[in-house]
Amino acid sequence: MNFDAFVIDIVTNGWNVFGAEVYEDRKLIHSFGDTTDNVHEIYSATKAVLSVTVDIAKEDVKFDIDKPITFYLPKNRIEALPEEQRRTFGRLSVRRFLTMSVGDLPFRPEGDSFLDFALNVKIRDPDTRVFNYNNISAYLVGVALAEALGTDLGKYIEEKLFAPLGIDKFEYARCPEGYFYGASGMKLTVNELSRVGMLLYNKGTYEGRRILSERYVEEATSVQQMNREGGYGYFLWKYRDGFSINGKWKQKCYILPERKLIVTYLSHIEDDSHDLLDSMEKYILGIQK
């Protein structure tokens, strides 16, 4: 591992990386930039926070991801739908949304009611699993979880996840109707995102305290739906011999248990290049291409 060379690459190329951390065998061994002082947009890495909250909530409410998502969504909104829409969404389990395997959903909800927008999308073949990455799926899971809990999901996350992890610098977004927006909009420090990664690396424990069930972590980090990138779990991505938390513009937390590594960085690089990833793999993972 040559972390200094990775940092030199970042600086020399002018990559807008806010900060980076590397953990080996649960210990912070390298850091660069702003890792603890300021929060930064993590975009779709927000979905990973929602994913772990799904399991945490099982301590307080029976939340069965194999039930139709309509079982948990507001009944008045479901009853107001045309019969065909009710039948269609009634065939879609929470698990299908967790694994991004519902076709036809556009990328993001729009309008004054994200919920009505989402529930009125025409799903042509609800029984066919197809990878369709979008924000609506995560939004609906968040609404379903909030309704099942009967409480504000953002506040619940603060109490049940962030407090045990020692996360106290954060921001998150809401939809126009006030529901926690589980798809994007969260801000964390680099170190705070690493803590979420460490929770998953430890198969659900943090500093000796069990927060998630080991079974859920195994399911969430395993391939549940195949895609071009190698597979998708419960709002988590397969990455080499491990998995990753991803957000646009290169927000990353790579969790590699077999290598005993966690690599986290937050940045703002608005392009589709793999230069930063290639540099990380070369100097941190020792992968030559």
Model-derived features: positions:
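Non-transmembrane alpha-helical segments in soluble domains
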Residues: 55, 70, 95-99, 142-146, ...
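Active-site helix/loop module of the DD-peptidase/beta-lactamase fold
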Residues: 60-100, 148-188
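Active-site SXXK
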Residues: 26, 41-66, 141-145, 196
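Catalytic-site signature segments of enzymes, centered on catalytic residues
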Residues: 29-36, 104-186
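Active-site Gly/Thr loop motif
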Residues: 215-266, 270
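Active-site-proximal alpha-helical segments within enzyme catalytic domains
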Residues: 140-144, 184-205, 251-267
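A short, well-structured edge-of-sheet supersecondary motif
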Residues: 3-36, 65, 253-256, 260-264
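Short, gly/Ser/Thr-rich active-site loops of penicillin-recognizing serine hydrolases
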Residues: 275-289
